[in-house]
């Protein structure tokens, strides 16, 4: 690999534009590919506009859009100009978006047509420049969503196409952007009370990408399919910056990745790399694979016997691998804990999965593995140039808070010195708030420090451990465990699709169905209590009829149900 002059996004892009000029950089699944040299030129075109409008080094520029090739062009245009990208998650509500724009002091916003209603009523003096990211058209002040299309076609101007001579002089010199300069501010929440703007530098992002490449190399022949939101650092660092650093191709879907959209796309792209969250594979396993393998009493009997279950998993896994295009060599899972039964299936089927661990504040990856070196229930080994310690570890179990120090750790929380101080120790270690164990170099996550329940005799009870047992039940999709009035409570969202399918044939009426579900919940409670320690036993179980509200990376927003 040709060495980077310095660890900045500008150096990354300039290097890749030369080394991989004629190769595909980004593309819609069914669209015309944008090559690396074209990507670089389009980045410069966007930069020229920003310079003409007075946007320069250090200015904040927001991005509010679904994933697309233009998202990456915009992100690199902002950061390689020396400005600061403020990516906003498309799931955020209007008031959350407004708060982020105000708090960050964003001078401009690149926004998709779909997201435009969120800023339609925002006072024009708050955001001076509004650009439609779909085609890089400038949106005039006072434009409404109703008039957006017609207004654009009549009165707006596209960003100027640069001449060859202009291209040479656009932007800053590489030396004008320092490794410690801020590249982006990522908001983990849009609400005023919980809003945290994570400040990441160019060095944070590039250093983390380089470290990940020591675990799992990416080459120019690799093909990525982008499924997770780009404003999340997991997708942005590992699904955008890292592949561009290595000359790989990134493909985007124009619609939500439902099975009818995703499966044909996977057959067309035949991706070699996918980055996902646990929920995706858990849904596939619980809704498709497990019901098929236990469809009748005979198959259930075979499935209950470990050797035949392993064989059935292997056969099902090979079919799944083929449905993913048949070329996958890295299926990365991060963002939350993976259900044990699903991981067992992936191991039995020799599916090329690997689990990683990280946070937005750490750019994100702290630990990871490649598919040949995974260990059951572990998130892999610590990145080679990062230091991790288990703080205040229990003398018996070795469990303690995971703390990190190194060049992947954020600079600060934006405009929030108090919170910044709270998450760093006096000797400079970042407090992740996660509990873990290190065994033979491998990291195992136990759960969130703030979620731990203290038992009557002082025992540490980890809700995530109990949840993993609950979630293995075939009729359960998701659950959360918490303490209420001194008792351990489980709130469970059942697999209603599977239950309805079973009872439709029996023509079960509503009264009988409610009775069945009540009995099922108690059966789940008894089954779980037989598998956990006495002090971890569930005293009360509650049906959660609606799906749990989740974050963009599909983590349950626990505070909505436990406070």
Regions found by a protein language model. Give the residues of each.
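Conserved AMP-binding A3 loop
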Residues: 35-37, 183-209
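Conserved AMP-binding/adenylate-forming core of the ANL superfamily
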Residues: 14, 22-68, 72-76, 93-98, ...
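Conserved ATP-binding/catalytic segment of the ANL
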Residues: 64, 382, 396-397, 401-455, ...
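Conserved pre-ATP/AMP-binding loop-to-beta segment of ANL
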Residues: 21-22, 154-187, 194, 217-223
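Conserved AMP-binding/adenylation subdomain of ANL enzymes
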Residues: 206-223, 230-318, 327
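Structural core segment of the AMP-binding/adenylate-forming
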Residues: 12-14, 80-160, 172, 486
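Conserved C-terminal "lid"/linker of ANL adenylate-forming enzymes
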Residues: 478, 486, 523-563
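Conserved ATP-binding loop and adjacent catalytic segment of the adenylate-forming AMP-binding
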Residues: 250-253, 338-393, 397-400, 408-411, ...
């Amino acid at each position: 690999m040709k060495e980077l002059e310095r660890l900045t996004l500008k150096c990354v892009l300039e290097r890749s534009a030369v080394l991989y000029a004629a190769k595909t950089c980004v593309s819609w699944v069914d669209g015309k590919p944008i090559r690396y040299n074209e990507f670089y030129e389009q980045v410069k075109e966007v930069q020229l506009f920003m310079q003409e409008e007075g946007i320069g080094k250090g200015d904040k520029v927001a991005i509010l859009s679904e994933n697309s090739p233009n998202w990456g062009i915009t992100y690199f245009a902002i950061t390689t100009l020396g400005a600061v990208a403020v990516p906003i998650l498309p799931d955020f509500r209007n008031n959350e978006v407004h708060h982020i724009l105000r708090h960050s002091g964003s001078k401009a916003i690149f926004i998709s047509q779909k997201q435009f209603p969120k800023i339609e009523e925002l006072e024009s003096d708050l955001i001076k420049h509004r650009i439609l990211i779909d085609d890089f058209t400038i949106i005039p002040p006072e434009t409404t969503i109703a008039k957006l299309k017609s207004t654009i076609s009549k009165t707006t101007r596209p960003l100027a196409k640069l001449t060859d001579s202009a291209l040479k002089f656009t932007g800053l010199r590489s030396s004008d952007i320092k490794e410690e300069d801020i590249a982006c501010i990522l908001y983990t929440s849009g609400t005023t009370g919980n809003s945290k703007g994570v400040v990441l530098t160019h060095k944070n992002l590039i250093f983390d990408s380089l470290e990940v490449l020591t675990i799992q190399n990416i080459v120019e022949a690799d093909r990525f399919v982008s499924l997770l939101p780009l404003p999340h650092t997991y997708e942005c660092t590992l699904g955008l910056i890292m592949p561009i650093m290595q000359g790989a191709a990134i493909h985007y879907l124009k619609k939500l990745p439902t099975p009818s959209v995703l499966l044909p796309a996977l057959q067309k792209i035949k991706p070699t790399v996918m980055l996902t969250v646990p929920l995706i594979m858990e849904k596939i396993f619980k809704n498709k694979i497990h019901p098929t393998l236990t469809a009748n009493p005979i198959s259930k009997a075979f499935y209950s016997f470990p050797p035949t279950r392993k064989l059935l998993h292997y056969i099902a896994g090979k079919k799944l691998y083929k449905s993913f295009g048949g070329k996958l060599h890295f299926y990365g899972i991060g963002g939350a804990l993976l259900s044990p039964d699903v991981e067992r299936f992936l191991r039995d089927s020799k599916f090329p999965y690997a689990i990683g661990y990280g946070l937005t504040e750490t750019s994100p990856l702290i630990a990871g593995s490649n598919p040949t070196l995974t260990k059951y229930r572990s998130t892999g080994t610590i990145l080679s140039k990062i230091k991790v310690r288990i703080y205040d570890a229990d003398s018996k179990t070795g469990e303690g808070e995971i703390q990190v120090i190194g060049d992947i750790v954020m600079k600060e929380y934006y405009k929030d010195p108090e919170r910044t101080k709270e998450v760093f120790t006096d000797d400079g270690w970042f407090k992740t708030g996660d509990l873990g164990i290190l065994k033979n170099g491998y990291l195992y996550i136990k759960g969130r420090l703030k979620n731990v329940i203290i038992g009557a005799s002082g025992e540490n009870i980890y809700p995530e451990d109990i949840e993993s047992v609950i979630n293995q039940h075939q009729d359960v999709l998701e659950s959360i465990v918490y303490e209420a009035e001194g008792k351990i409570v489980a709130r469970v969202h059942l697999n209603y699709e599977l239950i309805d399918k079973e009872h439709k044939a029996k023509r079960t009426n509503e009264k009988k169905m409610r009775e069945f579900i009540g009995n099922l919940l108690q059966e789940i409670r008894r089954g779980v209590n037989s598998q956990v320690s006495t002090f971890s036993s569930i005293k009360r179980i509650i049906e959660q009829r609606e799906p749990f509200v989740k974050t963009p990376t599909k983590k349950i927003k626990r505070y909505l149900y436990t406070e």
